Amino acid sequence: MPKLAIEVLNDYPLATEAIRDWFLKKMIESFEQDNAPEDFKKQMLSRGVSDITLAIMLDQSPRNFFDVFDENKIVIEVLRDTDINPDLFYYKINGKTPGTFFEQRIPCERAAVEKAFELLN
């Protein structure tokens, strides 16, 4: 059974902090190009990127983390098993696969991201 998203964040604090910093940096970059009111920008920056936000992203759309890991030389690929069963998915990280198969793409992505947290930590 996979860990809860909040457990992943707690188990890999160094990775969590690096990821939080990455998303905050991206938020700041987007504000520099955005015409949003200054008070809105300040409010969003003061909130930062919470563990709850990261946990929701991990559960609902784990591929949002792929760019973070790419920049840290942890490259995730999610593939279909075209040789044995094309209805199954598996992942590779830096060309290596754990040999685990998934019936749906999102659980496969989540497992890959969890492994990437471990590697980044």
What are the roles of these predicted feature ranges?
Residues 14-102, 114:
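N-terminal segment of the canonical double-stranded RNA-binding domain
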Residues 1-7, 116, 121:
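Long, terminal "pre-/pro-" and other extracytoplasmic accessory regions
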Residues 5-10, 23:
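Non-catalytic interaction/assembly regions
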Residues 13-14, 107:
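Generic detector of isolated residues embedded in canonical secondary-structure elements
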Residues 101-121:
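Ampiphathic alpha-helical segments that act as solvent-exposed interaction surfaces
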